[in-house]
Amino acid sequence: MFTSVYPKFHNICPRIEVEPIERSVRDQHPLLLSGELDLGFMTLTRSQQKSGIIYETLASEEMVLAVPTKLVTALDMRNGDLALLREEPFVLTQKTSTIREIVDSIFKNAGFTPNVLFETSNNHAIISMIHENICCGILPMYYMDPEDEAITYFQLPDHPSWEIVAAYRKGHYISKPARTLIELAGNYFTQ
């Protein structure tokens, strides 16, 4: 998002210095609360939000089940029934990721514990492994590639999702340039 939004921001506010700091959501929260970080962009559920922080929702994003197309055919998996994948390997995001709480809940609701091949912080790695017919995965819709015929995507029951938000400390003054950056980020996700 940042690399797409920043050039537009720089054209509007050329004299404003932005210091991007890449941190996990869990690391951003204390930095926002302490004032070390003015503005954060993150993905989380409402239950993961912390008091003392304002969250402006930029977009909501649904999770999808991603399965190698060859496996979909072999299992005659027309409706994306997650239970059919009980014995299949999954690559999941690391337990410290905000998405992992959602993913664990999806498996709990499906009535089984997944066979975890490995965990990663990189969703592109999950997509690569699925593309190579090594595993299945649950990902944000952002990572769907309808052009990739090696992967079939399914919506999940209850349509689990998270929010993409701009976050800042309650009572913290949001400057006009910061507001511009938030608006540009919101536009990015609604295009």
Walk through the language-model features, giving the residues of each.
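Thr-Gly-centered strand-to-loop micro-motif
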Residues: 93-94, 114, 139-140
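Central regulatory/effector-binding core of bacterial HTH transcription factors
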Residues: 1-47, 119-120
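A late-sequence structural motif
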Residues: 1, 152-191
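Flexible hinge/capping segments at coil-to-helix
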Residues: 52-90
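Alpha-to-beta junction loops
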Residues: 33-42, 63, 112, 130-137
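Short secondary-structure boundary/capping segments
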Residues: 10, 54-57, 73, 81-83, ...
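Short hydrophobic/charged patches on amphipathic alpha-helices used for structural packing
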Residues: 29, 33, 55, 82, ...
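Beta-alpha-beta core module
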Residues: 48-56, 60-61, 124-171
